[in-house]
């Protein structure tokens, strides 16, 4: 059963889970996670990071473009599952990868943004904001659905390992795509977009056509 406990945080917050069991699952757009955190912080949202990989560990941080700033640190393997459930349940939003924490977010009913280029969108649950490799660049994607994953190879990228196209399925997912997902789920952000559109209509000759 889902614990019926109040939120541990005051005010609105989002949860992020930027680590996973395979490197191919990571979102490897340089600086992407920090830009998303800054976007949320600047709009009054706390950002809670919940992964078993400890924040501040140089090796793990290097996979995220450096040590993330502006987060509430709830990382580490010492935190039990029920604690994770409570934090996710009361969040306004969850942003994660093709990993177990994303499935947990979906299971408790929290709006979920799932970032994955190495698996096709049909691989996970449907009712989420699913971010996939842009289809405008003829970019490689979906290797998880086309090849057997080698869990012993951290740099597993069956089509482009050791080439400039290594992990391009993930690198080409932009920060703007993730922010669009945030706007989709957070009503006040969507309202701001609509207000800007209306203002443009009023001030521009394009308003005659709307």
Task: Kindly give the residue locations of the regions a language model identified.
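Conserved residues at the C-terminal ends of beta-strands
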Residues: 17, 97, 146
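Donor-binding and catalytic core of enzymes assembling or modifying cell-surface/extracellular glycoconjugates
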Residues: 30-123
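Nucleotide-sugar donor-binding patch of glycosyltransferase catalytic domains
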Residues: 67, 74, 106-200
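Mid-sequence helix-capping/hinge segment at a functional interface
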Residues: 1-25, 189-192
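Long, low-complexity, intrinsically disordered segments
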Residues: 202-210
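Short, solvent-exposed polar/charged micro-motifs at secondary-structure junctions
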Residues: 3-7, 58-61, 83-85, 140-144
């Amino acid at each position: 059963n889902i614990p019926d406990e109040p939120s541990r945080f005051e005010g609105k917050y989002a949860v992020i889970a930027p680590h996973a069991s395979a490197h191919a699952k990571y979102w490897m757009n340089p600086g992407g996670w920090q830009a998303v955190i800054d976007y949320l912080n600047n709009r009054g949202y706390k950002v809670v990071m919940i992964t078993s990989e400890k924040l501040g560990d140089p090796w793990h941080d290097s996979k995220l473009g450096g040590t993330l700033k502006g987060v509430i640190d709830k990382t580490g393997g010492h935190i039990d599952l029920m604690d994770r459930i409570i934090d996710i349940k009361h969040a306004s939003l969850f942003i994660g990868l093709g990993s177990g924490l994303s499935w947990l977010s979906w299971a408790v009913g929290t709006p979920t943004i799932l970032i994955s280029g190495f698996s096709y969108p049909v691989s996970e649950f449907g009712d989420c904001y699913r971010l996939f490799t842009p289809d405008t660049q003829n970019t490689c994607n979906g290797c998880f659905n086309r090849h057997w994953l080698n869990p012993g190879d951290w740099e597993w990228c069956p089509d482009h390992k050791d080439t400039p196209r290594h992990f391009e399925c993930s690198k080409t997912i932009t920060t703007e795509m993730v922010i669009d997902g945030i706007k989709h789920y957070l009503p006040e952000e969507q309202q701001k977009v609509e207000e800007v559109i209306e203002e443009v209509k009023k001030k521009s000759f394009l308003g005659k056509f709307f």
